[in-house]
């Protein structure tokens, strides 16, 4: 995958596209089937906007924040299930995270900057596959799995293999176990000096 930081441009470079606002995962799957490869997903939009500003063409933009299932955090069978469109801020303040993964909530408050935490999504952070993004290493440490869905069905991929998978679909959620003995911390003091 391409590093998002390499994209540059202005709003005048954004070509025309059709915007779709589905309200269910089934509707997203129907749209992707209809469009073939002529679509792009957008959740928080931080990376997608940079790609569009760089002139990357897209015919159909599928906005995912209108799908409730992608914006939820819930406990399912001793696992925390986080929808792909949950923002970093919503994740760090969610009662299920604060109660069951306090250290993780504290670490999440240190990710990126406030703009990234407010707008950026868990799924976007993972799928961007950028070495400078922090979610993937945290979810690797948690032995998380990623849930995908398309018109043919649903499947899970270990978070370790998400960026290597050849089977693409809609990332619906990230799921990780509750209550083991892991302790999380983040040290931002070792930033490179310029």
Predicted segments with their positions:
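C-terminal structural segment of proteins
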Residues: 1-194
């Amino acid at each position: 995958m391409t590093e998002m930081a390499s994209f540059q441009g202005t709003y005048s470079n954004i070509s025309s596209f059709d915007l779709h606002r589905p309200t269910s995962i089934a509707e997203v799957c129907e749209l992707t089937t209809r469009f073939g490869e002529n679509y792009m997903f957008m959740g928080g939009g931080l990376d997608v906007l940079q790609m569009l500003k760089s002139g990357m063409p897209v015919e159909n933009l599928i906005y995912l924040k209108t799908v409730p299932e992608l914006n939820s955090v819930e406990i399912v069978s001793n696992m925390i299930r986080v929808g792909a469109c949950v923002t970093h801020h919503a994740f760090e303040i969610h009662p299920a995270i604060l109660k069951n993964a306090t250290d993780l909530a504290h670490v999440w408050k240190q990710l990126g900057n406030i703009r990234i935490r407010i707008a950026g999504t868990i799924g976007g952070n993972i799928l961007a596959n950028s070495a400078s993004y922090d979610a993937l290493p945290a979810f690797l440490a948690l032995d998380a799995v990623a849930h995908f869905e398309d018109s043919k069905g649903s499947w899970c991929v270990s978070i370790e293999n998400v960026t290597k998978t050849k089977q693409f679909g809609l990332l619906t959620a990230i799921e990780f176990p509750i209550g083991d003995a892991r302790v999380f911390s983040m040290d931002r003091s070792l930033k490179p000096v310029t």
